[in-house]
Amino acid sequence: MAIDENKQKALAAALSLIEKQFGTGSIMRLGEDRSMDVETISTGSLSLDIALGAGGLPMGRIVEIYGPESSGKTTLTLQVIATAQKEGKICAFIDAEHALDPIYAKNLGVDIDNLLCSQPDTGEQALEICDVLTRSGAVDVIIVDSVAALTPKAEIEGEIGDSHIGLAARMMSQAMRKLTSNLKNANTLLIFINQIRMKIGVMFGNPETTTGGNALKFYSSVRLDIRRIGSVKEGDVVVGSETRVKVVKNKVAAPFKQADFQITYGKGINIHGELVDLGVKNNLIEKAGSWYSYNGNKIGQGKNNVCNFLKYHPQLAAELDKKLREMLLHNTTRTESNSLVRDDEGTFDE
């Protein structure tokens, strides 16, 4: 489209003035923005990384993870921390619930000696700590556990039974406005864990809602709904849970995907089980009866034995992970092989 020469000169002068006043990159043409390829951190779950579309959670953004009690919210965030620390990133955990178990975190692969941890007294203190860490530019990942535990100072100083309508929502709204630009400039990922509540008197539609008002919903680039959908048993003993995560909002890729995976108690996400399932579905692993083969070589009989084989052969597991990511994340043609990534209706992608 041809633009009048006088308009072009006026536009160039305006852009130059804006950049002088606010800095280079403060305004640009959208197609020139090389930062559109968003840097991501793996969630620790291959199927969830694929469901997110970008290969993980986006840096410089706000992410909300919510669900019922004991659904795996904290476990998922600790897996994110473990993955980030392996890449040399600095992480912080704002434990507003005062319930973080360092032994459990260590079992999931978190380097607790290098994990920054704070147990704030008030919601304002927690959010201010987040802002200071972000503006330092030195912290890459911040977890807040949880929004429901971010109690305003006025509520703590008041008496039980006092009315504080909308206080937490106003606090969160103000914090979101302040944090968003700082997170982008520092390229820091901020993850809020949230709980669900039931709306009273809802006859139709979903009665569930999250705490802390609507601001977090709007400012989040990614929102994940995590649910426990079953149990994992060895004989009669329950050793883990079947977990489903729905991407209910996604600003960096297509939303409404679902990912199913197992969480083993005390160990975290069963990443080797995901590799086996996705490998079979994508014809990277051959299955004949109960035997599994890779590149023509048998690697085990039964899924549990194959998982143990991959556990003790990390190079093979890494090779399989790399091939699956290249196939499912960078392949523009969608195939039936995206089996563990499901759409909002619960049907498999085709």
Swiss-Prot record:
GO MF term list: ATP binding; ATP hydrolysis activity; ATP-dependent DNA damage sensor activity; damaged DNA binding; single-stranded DNA binding
Coarse class of the protein's main subcellular location: cytoplasm
Residues reported to bind ATP: G67, P68, E69, S70, S71, G72, K73, T74
One Pfam family recorded for the sequence: RecA
Coiled coil ranges: none
UniProt KW Nucleotide-binding keyword: yes
Record InterPro entries: AAA+_ATPase, DNA_recomb/repair_RecA, DNA_recomb/repair_RecA_CS, P-loop_NTPase, RecA-like_C, RecA-like_N, RecA_ATP-bd, RecA_C_sf
Membrane-crossing residue ranges in chain numbering: none
Keywords: ATP-binding, Cytoplasm, DNA damage, DNA recombination, DNA repair, DNA-binding, Nucleotide-binding, SOS response
A GO CC annotation given for this chain: cytosol
Location of this chain's protein in the cell: Cytoplasm
KW Manganese (keyword) present: no
Gene3D superfamilies: P-loop containing nucleotide triphosphate hydrolases
GO terms classed as biological process: DNA recombination; DNA repair; SOS response
Source organism superkingdom: Bacteria
Function: Can catalyze the hydrolysis of ATP in the presence of single-stranded DNA, the ATP-dependent uptake of single-stranded DNA by duplex DNA, and the ATP-dependent hybridization of homologous single-stranded DNAs. It interacts with LexA causing its activation and leading to its autocatalytic cleavage.
PANTHER family registered for this protein in UniProt: MITOCHONDRIAL DNA REPAIR PROTEIN RECA HOMOLOG-RELATED, RECA
Family: Belongs to the RecA family.
Protein name, per record: Protein RecA
